[in-house]
Amino acid sequence: MRVKEQLLTLRAYVPGKNIEEVKREYGLSKIVKLASNENPFGCSARVTEALTSLASQYALYPDGYAFELRTKVAEHLGVKAEQLLFGSGLDEVIQMISRALLHEGTNVVMANPTFSQYHHHAVIEGAKVREVPLKDGIHDLDAMLEQVDDKTKIVWICNPNNPTGTYVEKQKLLSFLESVPKSALVIMDEAYYEYAGAEDYPQTLPLLEKYGNLMILRTFSKAYGLAAFRIGYAVGNEQLIGQLEVARLPFNTSTVAQSVALAALEDQAFLQECVKKNEEGLHQYYAFCKEYNVFYYPSQTNFIFLKLGIPGNEAFERLMKKGYIVRSGAAFGIHDGIRITVGLKEENDEIIELLKELVNEQVKKEETYS
């Protein structure tokens, strides 16, 4: 028995090493994971309260339509409930959209590097993938527009972008939306939206009324700290969302996920405190990079991408031996960089000291051979 030919060209997603695995392999008692862009401050205390109230519902199927959460999210965003599509994390939302829109003979346009699942699901559905290199770490919308034709079903824009943390400015996005064919669905993946504080970062929700081919993705996994529960959503044209609902599994988001997302949404004070502390953490890294002349991308997310002057895989291994798990840029095709999730202040302090050691050692090596 053979699967689709295109599946043979892909690899299953392999997450980074887990904490217990690293402890065993390196004989360490303390591990700090700064590789998956999780919220180091956890989630709202209201989430724990919500969990305690669910014991009597474990044997029951969840509300497939997620009515209560849908209503509250719609109210929070200022959109209609019918404009929302919920999924088991944005991974499932991306899968649903790809399954519904793509097939052999169609294509998608995206940046490179960016979030890998856009490419993954396009290939599974038999669509061609047109990747456009980032320009100075940012989506090159002009070059992406040149790749769009009458066969283009989706244009993916990860904003802010993973893995660089950079963003597309408002005016550039507006110009792109005016120019791109209406037959192509422009999807703004805003998984890190809550962290984006730049003045010219585009507020896309008000654009939905004018641009019927615009869709926005957001999640509870990042700033809300609910990665374990897997829940995200799309916001878009009411008619298209209704059609996509057909591709959604009947009970795709659990009662637990819906309940904790609702609780987290109601605690905006906790969210804003996380965003504030994250900004402070980013500035710890900025100060280090400027002092040690380390290249970095200014970030609108809860992570930073930087280049230490050594291969990313080497930096990854050496930091892991010290108890710090980061993400090598090699995973994204940027072999001389690493991506680091902003952690607690003391975690940032500790890993920055390790980064200083790596930079100083590299400088000494270069001086020796010069």
Swiss-Prot record:
Its cofactor is pyridoxal 5'-phosphate. One of its GO terms (molecular function) is pyridoxal phosphate binding. It is an enzyme of class 2 (transferase). Pathway: Amino-acid biosynthesis; L-histidine biosynthesis; L-histidine from 5-phospho-alpha-D-ribose 1-diphosphate: step 7/9. One of its GO terms (biological process) is L-histidine biosynthetic process. Keywords: Amino-acid biosynthesis, Aminotransferase, Histidine biosynthesis, Pyridoxal phosphate, Transferase. Homodimer. This is Histidinol-phosphate aminotransferase 1. It comes from Bacillus cereus (strain ATCC 10987 / NRS 248). The gene is hisC1.
